[in-house]
């Protein structure tokens, strides 16, 4: 981490990766803030960015001081359709725009305390699971993208996708911004929920415009690396290149099925015995 107050021009994400740097991200916001009483289990939505900005800011700062090079906006499940899902009505009470704007402002404030970049993130949507059209789903992503562009995030992440088709739509929507795009799927070695292999998922994401591809959230570090290896092999076989990314779950999941930890009987409140300690 750069010294606090260092104001040198920051290198972009691709400049860092192309030079051989290993870039460390942050993560785990939803679970960490749920345990601290700021996120409601079930909806897992990020209205705390508006209602409790000091809590979100503090967690960003903890990641920065631990060595993170990227502050990811706390916009997981911050699409308009998700914010009004499951009776939570955040979109009605606050508005998706305010949640996304607040998350961007907090991430930038903390990133500028060091040499960190800000990544604006979108994730899977209820619209896709409700079988809405590609046009309708992309519209949801573009609503968040408008805020990310207004707040001038450094790059974009499409994360936590169980279906590669939706992930491709997200990448295509984000790529129109002209900013670098990373894409991660919450899959294991068996692939996405339609049976598309990790290698093919990676190929489709890169062809859609992602410069960085990988996995996140549903499986532990060991299984996540196995899956990333399959992605790498798929890209090599297709003659494609991309940087690789892994944001594993911080719980051991050797006995999980295709959907990872969410299928465990311990999910979500009894996972502590599975914690992957330092």
Curated annotation (Swiss-Prot):
It is an enzyme of class 2 (transferase). GO terms for biological process: amino-acid betaine catabolic process; L-methionine salvage; methylation. Pathway: Amine and polyamine degradation; betaine degradation; sarcosine from betaine: step 1/2; Amino-acid biosynthesis; L-methionine biosynthesis via de novo pathway; L-methionine from L-homocysteine (BhmT route): step 1/1. Found exclusively in liver and kidney. GO terms for molecular function: betaine-homocysteine S-methyltransferase activity; zinc ion binding. Binds 1 zinc ion per subunit. Its EC number is 2.1.1.5. One of its GO terms (cellular component) is nucleus. Its cofactor is Zn(2+). SUPFAM superfamilies: Homocysteine S-methyltransferase. It catalyses: L-homocysteine + glycine betaine = N,N-dimethylglycine + L-methionine. InterPro entries: Betaine-hCys_S-MeTrfase_BHMT, BHMT, HCY_dom, HCY_dom_sf. Residues 11-278 form the Hcy-binding domain. It is found in: Cytoplasm, Cytosol; Nucleus. It comes from the Eukaryota. Gene3D superfamilies: Homocysteine-binding-like domain (3.20.20.330). The modification N6-succinyllysine is found at residues 40, 93, 98, 232, 241. Pfam families: S-methyl_trans. Zn(2+) binds at residue 217. Involved in the regulation of homocysteine metabolism. Converts betaine and homocysteine to dimethylglycine and methionine, respectively. This reaction is also required for the irreversible oxidation of choline. Homotetramer. PANTHER family: BETAINE--HOMOCYSTEINE S-METHYLTRANSFERASE 1 (PTHR46120:SF2). This is Betaine--homocysteine S-methyltransferase 1. The gene is BHMT.
């Amino acid at each position: 981490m750069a010294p606090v107050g260092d104001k040198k021009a920051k290198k972009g994400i691709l400049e860092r990766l192309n030079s051989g740097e290993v870039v460390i991200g942050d993560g785990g916001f939803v679970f960490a803030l749920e345990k601290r009483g700021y996120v409601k289990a079930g909806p897992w939505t990020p209205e705390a960015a508006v209602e409790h900005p000091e809590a979100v800011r503090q967690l960003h700062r903890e990641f920065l001081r631990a060595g993170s090079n990227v502050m990811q906006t706390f916009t997981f499940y911050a699409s308009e359709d998700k914010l009004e899902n499951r009776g939570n009505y955040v979109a009605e009470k606050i508005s998706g725009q305010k949640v996304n704007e607040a998350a961007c402002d907090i991430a930038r404030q903390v990133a500028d305390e060091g040499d960190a970049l800000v990544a604006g993130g979108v994730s899977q949507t209820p619209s896709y699971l409700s079988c809405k059209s590609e046009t309708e789903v992309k519209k949801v992503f573009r609503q968040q993208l408008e805020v990310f562009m207004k707040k001038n995030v450094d790059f974009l992440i499409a994360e936590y996708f169980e279906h590669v088709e939706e992930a491709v739509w997200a990448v295509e929507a984000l790529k129109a911004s002209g900013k670098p795009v990373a894409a991660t799927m919450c899959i294991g070695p068996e692939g996405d929920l339609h049976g598309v292999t990790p290698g093919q998922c990676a190929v489709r994401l890169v062809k859609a415009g992602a410069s960085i591809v990988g996995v996140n959230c549903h499986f532990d570090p060991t299984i996540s690396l196995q899956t990333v290896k399959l992605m790498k092999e798929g890209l090599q076989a297709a003659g494609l290149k991309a940087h690789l990314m892994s944001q594993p779950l911080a719980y051991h999941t050797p006995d999980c099925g295709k959907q990872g930890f969410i299928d465990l009987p311990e999910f979500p409140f009894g996972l502590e015995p599975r914690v992957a300690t330092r």
